[in-house]
Amino acid sequence: MAKYLIDAKKNIDSIIFIEENIDKVCNLNLRRKVEELRREFYINCCVVLDKSHPKNKKKICEDKLIEAIYYERDKNCAHRDDDYKSLEFNQLSDMIETMKHQIQQVLVVCKDSLPNNITLDFVSHDK
């Protein structure tokens, strides 16, 4: 389960890398790459949540950050629903901050199921 949390963190790290190096990677389809990283992020976070709380989705979704993670996974990542409303971000940094808050909340909610020594140290990294 820790692997999925670390993979979700690496998705954020990759978006940080894109933001910091946008002038060097501008010839790539960045919109598609960022969307792919976000999709993987939400799927990985939900794997951690589902494995940590297999029968308590309704209860943990009382937390608005957790509810937003499931919303993205269920309405946009697993399949695109007609009623899906995407979050609008003016800058990649806004998206990064939102995702950081979300993964930190996943760590809090799932702390009893994860190793004690796991940390979320974000670094600019292209995987």
Regions found by a protein language model. Give the residues of each.
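Amphipathic alpha-helical interface segments
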Residues: 1-68, 83-127
